[in-house]
Swiss-Prot record:
PANTHER family: AROM/DEHYDROQUINATE SYNTHASE, PENTAFUNCTIONAL AROM POLYPEPTIDE. It comes from Methanocorpusculum labreanum (strain ATCC 43576 / DSM 4855 / Z). Pathway: Metabolic intermediate biosynthesis; chorismate biosynthesis. 3-phosphoshikimate binds at residues 20-21, 25, 163-165, 191, 304, 331. GO terms for molecular function: 3-phosphoshikimate 1-carboxyvinyltransferase activity. InterPro entries: Enolpyruvate_Tfrase_dom (IPR001986), Enolpyruvate_Tfrase_sf (IPR036968), EPSP_synthase (IPR006264), EPSP_synthase_CS (IPR023193), RNA3'P_cycl/enolpyr_Trfase_a/b (IPR013792). Phosphoenolpyruvate binds at residues 20, 92, 120, 165, 335, 377. This is 3-phosphoshikimate 1-carboxyvinyltransferase. One of its GO terms (cellular component) is cytoplasm. Keywords: Amino-acid biosynthesis, Aromatic amino acid biosynthesis, Cytoplasm, Transferase. It holds the Pfam family EPSP_synthase. The gene is aroA. The active site is at residue 304. GO terms for biological process: amino acid biosynthetic process; aromatic amino acid family biosynthetic process; chorismate biosynthetic process. Belongs to the EPSP synthase family.
Length: 422
């Protein structure tokens, strides 16, 4: 299904969608904790549902209620019945965190995903699990693969600059071993706030993580406790709403905890740097249109913001440089290339660099036919760009936003955006 976007002004109020990152972690930790945990206001998007389906297959008892998921955990197991495969669909978070958990289970677990996921790098994590003693089979360092455990613990070495999800997968699974686990990072850690989010979630469930000189230490003998978790709003998804307002109106977004450890909360200070009107009042953020000025933005710790910040930069006076996001080339698409392609097709003065892009604005954007490559963040960023384009923009895959923000189009329509699916 395509999305047709026409030039629009937006205004109004909307509640931020639930956090995808927090929902993944809540489902996984609840499944590892003995007893009953309730996850309140979770995001039920395609990625998080892949995680929920996987923990059910591995033995968690899941009950879906009204805006809540109740999970009876503590009994995950392998091997699974013959022929059962954990299909993580398009979710890199699911497959990477679950692979770590599978290495601690007594048996073999088989993983796969869709074509996009099966092209994304897994080798650093698979090598790390092998170093810990897991049996690993994979043809090319990507999915599909099998993991055979259990591993006890020990020292493990892994790059920190490919995906923070690798580190989170090792951390979450570490308490399940009989020995301490020391994770040594062989390169600097990118997207560190996501690892901090994992550590914070583990702490809420009773497990502590220590920082060592080159990584992390998780001591054995710790047990996850069952806890009820309220999932807060998602700054990554709210960024698209913020940018739409900064370019085409004024809106208020509620449900965003200022104390939340999400790294993408930095989007608010980025908007201020560009000159957008920003007012914060507790969990409410109001953004209004203003004349934007160019800025240099380091996205090493908030790479998911890249596509929408590039859209903002295209409308800022002067030359902006977005950098520090080389690992975006291994997302659902090569997200740097995908962003540059759609903005250039709309008339932006933008060029690709190894770890980001250079954008000179403001550009008069024109409608175009946008290829998303099945990437939800490209879909939403291009839809926002379409709000200020001189003619109609056609986005080739309206449905891919269901990965992280299923209600995106409806929320934008509620705010007055001229968007329709056909």
């Amino acid at each position: 299904m395509k999305l047709i976007v026409s030039r629009s002004q937006i205004s109004g109020c909307v509640h931020a969608p639930p956090s995808k990152s927090h929902t993944h972690r809540a489902f996984l930790l609840a499944s590892l904790a003995k007893g009953e945990s309730v996850v309140l206001s979770p995001l039920l998007g395609e990625d998080t549902l892949a995680t929920l389906s996987a923990v059910k297959a591995l033995g968690a008892n899941v009950c879906e209620g009204d805006d809540r998921i109740t999970i009876q955990g503590g009994n995950l197991h392998a091997p699974l019945p013959k022929g059962t495969v954990i299909n993580c669909k398009n979710s890199g978070t699911s497959i990477r965190m679950l692979a770590g958990i599978a290495s601690r289970l007594d048996g073999t677990t088989e993983f796969t995903g869709d074509a996009s996921l099966c092209s994304r790098p897994m080798k650093p994590l698979l090598d790390a699990l092998s170093e810990l003693g897991a049996g690993v089979t994979s043809d090319n360092g990507c999915a599909p693969f099998t993991i055979t455990g259990p591993v006890s613990g020990g020292d493990v070495h892994i790059r920190g600059d490919v995906s923070s999800q690798f580190i989170s997968g090792l951390l979450i699974s570490a308490p399940l071993g009989k020995a301490d686990t020391r994770i040594h990072l062989t390169t600097p850690l990118t997207s560190k706030p996501y690892v901090d989010m994992t550590i914070s979630a583990m702490k809420k469930h009773g497990v502590s993580v220590e920082t060592i000189e080159d990584g992390y230490l998780v001591r054995s003998g710790q047990v996850y406790s069952s806890e009820d978790v309220q999932v807060g709003g998602d700054y990554s998804s709210a960024a698209f709403l913020f940018a739409a307002a900064a370019l085409a109106g004024e809106i208020a977004v509620s449900g965003l905890d200022p104390a939340d450890p999400q790294g993408d909360q930095v989007v608010i200070s980025i908007l201020e740097t560009f000159g957008a009107g920003v007012v914060r009042d507790g969990e409410n953020v109001t953004i209004r249109k203003a004349a934007l000025k160019a800025a240099d933005i380091d996205l090493a710790n908030a790479p998911d913001l890249f596509p929408i910040i590039a859209v903002l930069a295209s409308q800022a006076k002067g030359t902006s440089r977005l950098y520090g996001a080389a690992h975006l080339r291994f997302k659902e698409s090569d997200r740097i290339m995908s962003t540059v392609l759609f903005l250039r097709s709309m008339g932006a003065d933008i060029s690709e660099t190894e770890d980001g892009c250079i954008v000179t604005g403001p550009a008069n954007l024109s409608g175009a036919n946008v290829t998303t490559f099945g990437d939800h963040r490209i879909m939403m960023a291009s839809a926002v760009a379409g709000l200020i384009a001189d003619s109609t923009t056609t986005v080739d895959d309206a449905g891919c936003c269901a990965v992280s923000y299923p209600g995106f189009v409806k929320d934008m329509q509620k705010l007055g955006a001229d968007m329709r699916e056909e």
